[in-house]
Amino acid sequence: MTIHGAVIIEQGVTFAIIAVKQSVTMYTARMVQTRHELAQFFPNMPIILMSQDNSGTPHYY
Protein backbone atom coordinates (compact mmCIF):
# COMPACT_ATOMS: atom_id res chain seq x y z
CA MET A 1 0.00 0.00 0.00
CA THR A 2 1.27 3.44 -0.91
CA ILE A 3 0.04 6.38 1.13
CA HIS A 4 0.26 9.91 -0.25
CA GLY A 5 0.00 12.44 2.51
CA ALA A 6 1.72 14.56 5.11
CA VAL A 7 1.87 15.06 8.84
CA ILE A 8 1.46 18.74 9.62
CA ILE A 9 2.01 20.70 12.82
CA GLU A 10 0.11 23.98 12.75
CA GLN A 11 -0.21 26.22 15.81
CA GLY A 12 0.74 23.31 18.04
CA VAL A 13 -1.81 20.91 16.53
CA THR A 14 -0.51 17.79 14.78
CA PHE A 15 -2.67 16.16 12.11
CA ALA A 16 -2.37 14.10 8.93
CA ILE A 17 -3.70 14.97 5.49
CA ILE A 18 -4.04 11.96 3.19
CA ALA A 19 -4.88 12.08 -0.53
CA VAL A 20 -7.56 9.57 -1.51
CA LYS A 21 -9.69 8.87 -4.57
CA GLN A 22 -12.90 10.85 -4.90
CA SER A 23 -14.90 7.62 -4.56
CA VAL A 24 -13.66 7.30 -0.96
CA THR A 25 -15.09 10.66 0.06
CA MET A 26 -18.46 10.17 -1.64
CA TYR A 27 -19.81 7.94 1.15
CA THR A 28 -19.58 8.45 4.90
CA ALA A 29 -19.08 4.74 5.59
CA ARG A 30 -16.07 4.58 3.26
CA MET A 31 -14.54 7.70 4.84
CA VAL A 32 -14.91 6.21 8.32
CA GLN A 33 -13.47 2.87 7.19
CA THR A 34 -10.53 4.55 5.45
CA ARG A 35 -9.72 6.68 8.50
CA HIS A 36 -9.86 3.57 10.67
CA GLU A 37 -7.45 1.72 8.35
CA LEU A 38 -5.04 4.68 8.24
CA ALA A 39 -5.07 5.20 12.03
CA GLN A 40 -2.39 2.53 12.50
CA PHE A 41 0.05 4.67 10.48
CA PHE A 42 -0.95 7.96 12.12
CA PRO A 43 -1.62 7.12 15.78
CA ASN A 44 -3.18 9.66 18.13
CA MET A 45 -3.78 12.33 15.51
CA PRO A 46 -6.75 13.53 13.48
CA ILE A 47 -6.80 12.32 9.88
CA ILE A 48 -8.06 14.65 7.16
CA LEU A 49 -8.96 13.02 3.84
CA MET A 50 -8.41 15.06 0.68
CA SER A 51 -9.81 14.24 -2.74
CA GLN A 52 -9.98 16.20 -5.98
CA ASP A 53 -12.99 16.62 -8.23
CA ASN A 54 -12.86 16.37 -12.03
CA SER A 55 -11.59 19.94 -12.35
CA GLY A 56 -8.79 19.33 -9.84
CA THR A 57 -10.34 21.33 -7.00
CA PRO A 58 -9.38 19.81 -3.63
CA HIS A 59 -12.03 18.89 -1.07
CA TYR A 60 -11.19 18.12 2.56
CA TYR A 61 -13.13 15.81 4.90
For the regions a protein language model found, what residue spans apply to each?
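A cross-kingdom feature that marks ATP-driven nucleic-acid transaction machinery
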Residues: 1-61
